[in-house]
Amino acid sequence: MHTQVLFEHPLNEKMRTWLRIEFLIQQLSINLPIADHAGALHFFRNISDLLDVFERGEVRTELLKELERQQRKLQAWVEVPGVDQDRIEALRQQLKSAGSVLISAPRIGQQLREDRLIALVRQRLSIPGGCCSFDLPTLHIWLHLQQPQRDAQIETWLASLNPLTQALTLVLDLIRNSAPFRKQTSLNGFYQDNGDDADLLRLILTLDSQLYPQISGHKSRFAIRFMPLDSENGLVPERLDFELACC
């Protein structure tokens, strides 16, 4: 059983979008293989949410900019004595490769948007109970296909996201590992500090405290209010130690 809980909070819009995309892509794989109606609806709902996120911004453009920014940051480390040059060069090549694959890929999500089954299910998701067999006979017959046939189709759908997934995973890994966790202490359930142009806050609390953070702010400054899970009887200690990384 976990004794610590990690919370992450974005400090700008691009990071908020990236974390949502990461979450949705992870959700797509949780219930695989799809063998029943519940698993299918979970999968298609996350596909629909993912396409909605894609339509709200220039995901590819922002990721390409970030890949270039991370390459520049790595270049600055080359001159630092004692740095693992091979590791730096390997990361730079990974960033360069991910950028090349992403820029040459079709429009993100285009294959999913054009798929007839996904489009049909997506239209019905906003209707309460709108995915019954009489509403979506296409989905009903799809769920009665042989498992390998469904698996192959899902694999094709997910493969269309690989250029995005590869670039996003690399970028988020570098950002998350860009700053160490440091011990901090809140007073009367409140903590604030400068953001120093950070993109992401990462915070670790012990599970036995049964507290969660409410975080607000941006890249320059942020504030954290610690709240009890039990809003009626829970208590927040006068001094609370936690770990924080500004990435």
Swiss-Prot record:
SUPFAM superfamilies: YacF-like (SSF160950). It is found in: Cytoplasm. Keywords: Cell cycle, Cell division, Cytoplasm, Septation. One of its GO terms (biological process) is FtsZ-dependent cytokinesis. The keyword Cell cycle applies. GO terms for cellular component: cell division site; cytoplasm. The keyword Cell division applies. InterPro entries: ZapD (IPR009777), ZapD_C (IPR027462), ZapD_sf (IPR036268). Belongs to the ZapD family. Interacts with FtsZ. Cell division factor that enhances FtsZ-ring assembly. Directly interacts with FtsZ and promotes bundling of FtsZ protofilaments, with a reduction in FtsZ GTPase activity. HAMAP family: ZapD. This is Cell division protein ZapD. It comes from Salmonella arizonae (strain ATCC BAA-731 / CDC346-86 / RSK2980).
